Amino acid sequence: MIFKNNQLSSRFKQVFHNTGFGIMIVDKNRNLIEVNPKFCRMLGFKREELIGENAQIIHISNKAYKDFGEKAFNLVRNKRPVNLDWPFKKKNNEKIWFRIAGDPVADKDEVLWTVVDITERVKAKNKIEILASKLSRYLSPQVYQSIFSG
């Protein structure tokens, strides 16, 4: 990314390298062309291991990669912002859940993605759903409804 103003470029670099969000920029073929340090730490990769690679490297499966392309990537390429929860995989193949938001990069055939790790939230939600399901077996439908419908 080239800026005419050196101060703006310096400020952008500081934000890019120090933000609490993971950031990746991909080209029209979904190749990773830039990632920030937070993104690398979240996934356990070194920058050099990601740059130039296809984004498929961070998806949990071929199907997930294709589905993400249809549900998210193509929308962003058509100038529609995207914000969703999606599972990815770390270098060690451990699943990680991201809240991912994407926007097209102005005047380029690239997409800027920002990610936040929501893995613990997803795990907690799943536990609550399992417990609620178990609890529903022991309570009458009326009592269960009064508890969980507010």
Predicted regions and their residues:
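Conserved hydrophobic beta-strand signature of PAS-family and PAS-like sensory domains
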Residues: 32-33, 95
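Terminal output helix/cap of sensory domains in signal transduction proteins
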Residues: 62-94, 101
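PAS-associated C-terminal cap
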Residues: 1-11, 116-126
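Regulatory cytosolic signal-relay segments
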Residues: 118-150
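PAS-family sensory/regulatory domains
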Residues: 37, 49-63
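Sensory modules in modular signal-transduction proteins
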Residues: 6-25
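PAS/PAS-like sensory domains across diverse signaling proteins
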Residues: 29-31, 41
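Short loop/turn elements at sensory-signaling interfaces that couple input to output
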Residues: 99-114
